[in-house]
UniProtKB/Swiss-Prot annotation:
The gene is COA8. Induction: In conditions of increased oxidative stress, the protein is stabilized, increasing its mature intramitochondrial form and thereby protecting COX from oxidatively induced degradation. Required for cytochrome c complex (COX) IV assembly and function Protects COX assembly from oxidation-induced degradation, COX being the terminal component of the mitochondrial respiratory chain. It is linked to Mitochondrial complex IV deficiency, nuclear type 17: An autosomal recessive mitochondrial disorder with highly variable clinical manifestations and severity. Clinical features vary from acute neurometabolic decompensation in late infancy to subtle neurological signs presenting in adolescence. Encephalopathic episodes are characterized by acute loss of developmental milestones including ability to walk or sit, loss of speech, episodes with somnolence and seizure, and pyramidal signs rapidly evolving into spastic tetraparesis. This is Cytochrome c oxidase assembly factor 8. It is a peripheral membrane protein. One of its GO terms (cellular component) is matrix side of mitochondrial inner membrane. It comes from Homo sapiens (Human).
Amino acid sequence: MLPCAAGARGRGAMVVLRAGKKTFLPPLCRAFACRGCQLAPERGAERRDTAPSGVSRFCPPRKSCHDWIGPPDKYSNLRPVHFYIPENESPLEQKLRKLRQETQEWNQQFWANQNLTFSKEKEEFIHSRLKTKGLGLRTESGQKATLNAEEMADFYKEFLSKNFQKHMYYNRDWYKRNFAITFFMGKVALERIWNKLKQKQKKRSN
């Protein structure tokens, strides 16, 4: 996967996701979505102010009782998730939410750094090839000089080869984290079912 593949689709739209309805979500959103999730519209000024070392801190409506997916981050191209915290959040639900938040921060940091490295090395590669050809950074018409697809394929191949081990470790950790999240989601689901059963028993006894 190239760094740019971490981008999000469907920018500028607002979607309400609720449990019990079949709705398509990108892999990242599926990993973080829970009882409810809403997609915030993209805001240009907000993206410009995003820091490369953290997740964008957009603010959903105060009365919202769902998770919100924000606009794509300027550096990682990932949509940050603002997790809803219910008043009666159980210790197990809190542990799941914090695990999701920590995983999101980790994922954000990796792709922000990786995309920055990708862009920097890409520009250096283009400049080097143009210099070898005796060409400048601008064409005669003043446009930015570029390389053809075959020449850029050499860069992509070299970049992927050089970062193979880094991507391998990332994928390994990504699967571990998602397995842990899925495990705790199962525990939370069982906890909620058990609580509902206890409430029904209390009503019957009364």
